[in-house]
Amino acid sequence: MPFIATTESERTEMLQAIGVNSFDELIADIPYSVRLQRALELLPSLDEPQVRRLLERMAASNRCTAEYVSFLGGGAYDHFIPSAIKTIISRSEFYTAYTPYQAEVSQGTLQAIYEYQSLMCRLYGMDVANASMYDGATALAEAVLMAMNVTGRDQVVVAGKLHPHTTAVLKTYLEASGHQAIIQNALVDGRSDIAALKALVNQQVAAVVVQQPNFYGCLEEVEAIGAITHEQGAIFVVSADPLSLGVLAAPGSYGADIAVGEGQPLGSSQSFGGPYLGIFTVKQQLVRKIPGRLVGMTKDRDGEDGFILTLQTREQHIRREKATSNICSNQALNALQAAVYLSLLGKQGLQQVAAQSAQKAHYLANAIAALPGFSLKFTAPFFREFVVETPMPAAHLIEQMVEQRMFAGYDLATHGESGLLIAVTEQRTKEELDAFVAALSALKA
């Protein structure tokens, strides 16, 4: 489609309609120092073959996990995605569907979401799941706001190491809604200091939040954290890696009131950070406070099963000040990916993926710890991710390993800490793990 610019007279008419005399007056609130003071350096117009060649050259400069052995984690993991997933979600009835407002003509989409919700409830050991949130970080932030709404309290305690990006999103949500800042519990050996946590949690705390496994990969003492939370009448919020639940206990089994998670490991590609999937589940007593969409099963007038959007308490449906949340969309396609992934793998398949990831991670951790100059930063148990102290800056190590066609891990210096965060999935072979260790041992300081 060609771009047809507005004329000078049309621009003048639009400016007059909104009550300003010039474009500069329209953008007066934008500091002059941050405005571009030169003409845009645009390419000349290109035909389709030229555009294709240009984009292919640009794309060729990327380094991806199809060509490099990846040990990157920190929230996005290189798990295998069965080809059947793309085939199913690419069907036009799924791929083009948006909000199923008209239930009578959206039964297929609604049933797919209902099946996703059912799978999340089984996986997390909870009673109700919504149709999804934007991502794991926004799901956690919404969970905390929900806890504050339920309890009438204004503080949140973070037990253990929460992903820094999630912490940033949570702070943004709380500051924008006028709530108090986050209280961070102390850490011991990479996870929550239980004694310190007990002293922190009181009758002013709305929620205690824990990530399982935490950002460092360490497994938190979730049962003890849950007990401390409930002693003070607070809401226990768990952000659990869904794939880890193939081998770890479900949040519902150790008392989580709200359990959320980042659904990327369930069939979504890493995709340079998104789009991802926010999982949100609750216990039955909190169902009327749940944010986002919720699909329910009902009977039509002929007695046949049907699916509808139910308990719609978002700002689109009721007064904004009475709404449980102002979220106005969900990640239905990514939720479908997760449902297809779990359906294809089944219970045993998920257990095998989780077990292989854990076993290979521990094999690699032991091998790296035996190298001169390398050591594990924490002794706490972990799932498929761990932190290594290195004999050189992690950034330098990562740079050298890229030359060996390996992504060595995530540099914690990004967050002002020492160490290299390494993740291992079921995709890594023993040959790749051994080659990684050999490459590390040959590095130059």
From Swiss-Prot:
NCBIfam families: PRK00451.1. The gene is gcvPA. GO terms for molecular function: glycine dehydrogenase (decarboxylating) activity. The keyword DNA repair does not apply. Keywords: Oxidoreductase. This is Probable glycine dehydrogenase (decarboxylating) subunit 1. HAMAP family: GcvPA (MF_00712). The lineage of its organism: Bacteria, Pseudomonadati, Chlorobiota, Chlorobiia, Chlorobiales. Its EC number is 1.4.4.2. The keyword Transcription does not apply. It comes from Chlorobium chlorochromatii (strain CaD3).
